[in-house]
Amino acid sequence: MNTVQSLDELLDLAHKHVGVCVSLYMPTYRKGAETQQNQIRFKNLIRDAENQLMQRDLRPSETRELLSPAQELMNNELFWRNQKQGFALFLSPDSFHSFKSPDSFDELVVVAERFHLKPLIRIMARDIVFFILAVSLRNIRLFECTRRQQKEIPLEGIPRGLSEALDLDDFEKRLQLHTGSEDTKAQALKFFQQVDRGLQEYLRDRRDALIFAGVEYLFPIYREANTYPRLLETTISGNPEGLSADELHGLAMPLVEAILQEKENDALSQYRKSAGTGLASRDLREIIQAAHHGRIGILFVAHGVQEWGVFDEDNGRIHMTEPNDPISEDLLDFAAIRTLLNGGTVHVFDPSSVPGGGPIAAVFRY
């Protein structure tokens, strides 16, 4: 079983088009007696998948073979006791992938010619990369992070702290109280300039946000030494020396959410500017055709909503269907995947936040 770790790996799944693909989403419990419900829920959803496969006229032997990896997983008690908030499974005749989510999923089983990926896009599209620089005069640590995980980067060629010959307690006190400040600040600035030069080896050509973690009086000095253009003005304030990687990551999340919110607000602003110019639409049929031709720059789709239908790629016609129709797919999912594959941006919002309050909206490139 392969684990989906990134948006690129998700898009690899999007290329799968092998006749029958099973996509399964479910909430999971992390601890306690409730973890037993994970297996029960999974068993019920696999039964749902069996029924949908029967509607597609698969032979019983084909259904058993396709679902056999899921049946084996069903009986793995250790696996189900080691979950996060949500679980997703993707099965086809030649692939078996899973994803443990930090966010919960609604129960959903989709059997179609493509994998149903919109619930996962909601998480992956917001899983931006960022760096945390934990700074003190005694130690420097650098972490590369996403919303879901973090790892410390071993630093070479970077001073780990000011000279041991200095009385750092006295040095920090003078910095904090601004006594003897010019000479003291000059020493700290020189130290941070060395740190900045060393970081260039790790951050060169990167465009990801850098979050400073350290006491407030050090940040203005570090900012003066810094040459990395994506250093945030907001910081994790306080001495980071006693904080673990997980603790620093947790403190960074409100700052990361603010970055994501700004990007989402910019996208909504772009939609408002484009409305009425022919470069924006809330019409499902128009958007599906635009997604097929790679015209969408920004797409908004509603979380937890499906629009079932069939899009004929040869003639561009769209036929809406019932959810249980074996030939149908979620057209919102189709639009999201096509937009990502063509280099556009997808925002999966709560339905009330999609422009116009509908299930879908888009800004066109042309």
Residue ranges and their predicted role:
Residues M1-Y366:
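Terminal alpha-helical anchor/extension segments at protein ends
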